């Protein structure tokens, strides 16, 4: 599809539906919908005439699971980004990705990555008949904020994009230092930025058991000295991109388990894989329960808000060996609401 083909009512309306998904209750979405037909017709026009320019983004902090600065685009810019990413960029950028690049892709994601790690552990035990071995666990320091614009643009040029698309993407890139969290394009750009690195680990370092979720990745290997060599090579590669690994990067025994994607996954000597929910997630849920016990009787939180939050946590926790913990939390929620759920 070419840029001119996304400048139609049908494509922009579909992009609008994608942009509003899960956000219909927000003021910006409601404001756009008041004059929906007029807004879409106008957006098609300014895209066709190539006079579209992104607006000012909204800046705020999120605090779960950790404090992060988010730069959210205006709703109309979210619509444009969906139109471009979904129709022009996604397939072109992701077609070279390795299987074990897990973030922000169709049919992948957090739980796909967890299942791949489990498969790696099982395969490792079947191959070596032991849980002895080593893990190199890495995390890129301030990944989004550290992405070099010129190097990213070089990677985009290799995609052979139309000039109008490339120029528009450069505007998104240059709207802030690094890449702004909250932009759909930023997620895809971040994946692209380390795509060559993924191939380097798999094809040059010959690491069979490797997985990455955005800036968080692991290598599993029976030889500690080889992982020490890999770490030196990885640091050099990151330096060439203007990135650095943070202080959490370390090499440790497989038997310690891997803290990845919200769970601590262990390989036992018998070959069993055990997945435990990260302690910080349990701690946050217990804090919520204490707040709900005070706030619900006072009318400061609704039944629907409690159920929505609990159900999201429970669905995530269900991917681990957490039956007893989930029952405990469920019982407390039922006690707060005074009803069975």
PLM regions and their residue ranges:
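Beta-rich nucleic-acid/ligand-interaction surfaces
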Residues: 103-112, 218-221, 253-257
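Right-hand nucleic-acid polymerase module
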Residues: 73, 78, 82, 172-175, ...
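Short, conserved aromatic-histidine micro-motifs
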Residues: 51-54, 207-214, 284-297
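PAPS/PAP-binding and catalytic site of the sulfotransferase fold
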Residues: 84-87, 234, 238
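Conserved polymerase palm-domain catalytic core
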Residues: 39, 46, 115-214, 219-235, ...
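Conserved two-metal-ion catalytic palm core of "right-hand" nucleic acid polymerases
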Residues: 1-152
